[in-house]
Amino acid sequence: MERYGHLAGVIPVDEIDDMFESNVIGGTSSIDCVRLASNTPEGTVNLTVRIEFCPSAACTYSCRL
């Protein structure tokens, strides 16, 4: 979660936590990316992320909007 702390200026960190917790992907999931959306007074913020379990730190996949 610390990785996404810079978004706190746009979305409260606890709301980002809630979005991740409601979109947990298991290690055997076939879902590649999760799209997270939050409505703020300034507009809708959309994040597309990949959640991977990387025991060897070999994750190279990146998601795109």
Curated annotation (Swiss-Prot):
There is a cross-link at residues 48-54, 60-63 (Beta-methyllanthionine (Thr-Cys)). One of its GO terms (cellular component) is extracellular region. It comes from the Bacteria. The keyword Secreted applies. Contains LL-lanthionine, DL-lanthionine, and DL-beta-methyllanthionine, when coepressed in E.coli with the flavecin synthetase FlvM2. Lanthionine-containing peptide that does probably not show antibacterial activity, since its analog [+2]Flvbeta.h does not show antibacterial activity against M.luteus. Also does not show antibiotic activity when tested with [Del2]Flvalpha.a, an analog of Flvalpha.a, which is encoded by the same operon than Flvbeta.h. The bactericidal activity of lantibiotics is based on depolarization of energized bacterial cytoplasmic membranes, initiated by the formation of aqueous transmembrane pores. It is found in: Secreted. The gene is FlvA2.h. Keywords: Secreted, Thioether bond. The keyword Secreted applies. Residues 1-27 form a propeptide. The modification 2,3-didehydroalanine (Ser) is found at residue 30. There is a cross-link at residues 29-33, 56-59 (Lanthionine (Ser-Cys)). This is Lantipeptide Flvbeta.h. The modification 2,3-didehydrobutyrine is found at residues 28, 44.
